[in-house]
Amino acid sequence: PAAAGAEPQRLVDINEYVVRGNTVLDNRAIEAAVYPFLGPQRSLGDIEGARDALQAAYQEKGYQSVYVELPEQQVSGGVVYLQVTETTVGRVRVVGAKHYSPVELREEVPALEEGKVPDFAQVQRELAQVNRTPGRQVLPMVREGQRPGTMDVDLQVEDKNPWHASIGLNNDYSADTRHLRSVVSLGYDNLWQLGHAISLTYFTAPQDQDNAKVWSGSYTAPLSQRWSVQLSGYQSDSDVATVGSMNVVGQGHSYGVAAIYSLPVTGLWSHSFSFGVDFKDFEEQTRIGGNNDRVPIKYAPLTLSYNGFRYTERSQLALGLSLVAGTGSLLGYGDDDEEFDRKRYRAKSGFGVLKGDLNHTLTFGGDWQVATKAAFQLASGPLISNEQFAAGGATSVRGYLAAENTADDGYLLSQEWRTPSLGRFLGKRAGGYVNDWRFYVFAEGAQLRLQDALPEQDDDFSLASVGIGTRAQLADWLSGSLDWAFPLLEGTNTDKHDSRLHFSVQASF
C-alpha cells in the first residue's frame, strides 16, 4: 500500500552522452567513462553514474580543477548532455624566495601554465623534482582567481642560504696511526642561479697529517629536468700502517665523470641511474724493514649505479646498487694484467665488482625506532687493495679499528634499536636547543673472504660486536654521537672483548 503510492521511476533509452566544455580529455577517455551507462531502460541513477564516472576520469588524469555537471534537460532522442566546467590557471607568483631566482623556480613548474587547465599530478611530479634540491622547499597555494573561471597559484618558497660548511672531529682511526680525524667541507648549491652544486672536503689526522691527508671535491650540473652531469675526484697522501712492520705509503688520485638520470617520481619512490668512468692513479710504496718496494697502479673502471629512495611519515628507505668493471687498456689508460698481478697475486685489469647497500629506519608508535644497515660486495676474482671491501670502524662494525679487515668479497649487517627522542621533552626546557636526542643499543657484524689467498695469508675474516650509544642534534647546527662497543670476535688489530669508545662531533653552518 505504501509502495503503491510511490511514483514509478522514469526509465529512458540512452544512445549517446554529449559532453560540452571539454578541452583536455580525448574522445576515447570520455567514451570509456560513460559507455557502461548507455542502453535501454536507464534511470536517473544511471545518468548520475555517467557524470560521476566522467568526473573520476578527470581526477585520474590529474585535472582536479574540472567539474562535471548534469544540467536540467528533457531527454529526447536518446541524447543526454553533460556540462564540463574547466578552471584554468590565472596568475602564478613565486613568493618568499630569498636565495633562489623566482624566474628560474617558475620555469621549473611548466605544468602551471597560465590560461591552461593544470594537470595537478604533473605539478606534483615537477614540485617533487624541485624539492630535491637541498635547503629548498616549494609548496603551491591555490586560491580563487581575479578573473572568473580562473585560479591563482602562489608558489611558497622556504629556502636556505646555498652556502654550507661543516667541521667535524672523531676518533675513527686505523691501525698504528694517531687517534683523531677531522674533516672540513665547504659547498654551494646554486651556482649561476641554475642549481649547479660544488663542494670541497679536506680530511686529515690533525695530530699527524702524514697519517691521512685527502682532498676531495665534486661539481654537479643539471642539464635538464632529468639529466645531470657530475665531476668528482680526490687526491690522497697518507701513511697508513697495516700489518706488523709493514707500512703502505699511499699517494694517488682519482678523477671521474658521471651522467645521472633521475626517473619520474612514482608514488613515494624516487629513483636515479648513473653511468661514469673514474681515472685512478695510485703510487704506493711498501716498506718492510729496510726494504722499499714501489707498486704503482693506474686504471679506469666504469661504474653503472642505481639509487632509490622511499620516504613516508614513519619509514625512510635508501637503496644502492653498483656494477664496477675494469677496462684494462680499453680506454687507452691503465696498466695491463702483469702490473695488476704484481700488485696483487692473480688480480686482473678486467675485474668486475657488484656492490650494494641498504639503509632503513622505521618509526613505531611512541616514537620508538629500528634502524637497519646492510652492505655487500661480490668480486669476479682477486682485487687490488683499492677496490676491496672494508669492514670495521665507527661507520661499519663498531668496536674495531677503521678498515680493520679488507677482502675481495664481503657483507655487513647492522641493527639499532632506538628510544623515543628526548628532544620533545627537553626542547622547551633546554631553550629549544635539543632538536633530537636518542639512546640506542646495537648489534652488527661482517664477514669477508679473500680469493686466491697466498699460503701465509688468512682468507676469511669475521667481525661482530654489540654495544650502546647516544646521538643528539642540538639546535640546527651541532650534532654528535658516543658509542661504547664490545667486540665479540678477535680482529686483526683488536682483541676479543676489548671494548672501545667511538665519538663524533660535527658543526654545520
Give the label of every model feature segment:
Residues P1-Y173, F203-K213, L354, A374-A375:
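Periplasmic polypeptide-binding modules associated with outer-membrane biogenesis and secretion
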Residues D172-R181, F203-K213, N405-D408, L489-D498:
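Solvent-exposed loop/turn segments connecting transmembrane beta-strands
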Residues F340-F509:
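C-terminal transmembrane beta-barrel domains of outer membrane proteins
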Residues A53, R125, T150, R181, ...:
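Transmembrane beta-barrel architecture of outer-membrane proteins
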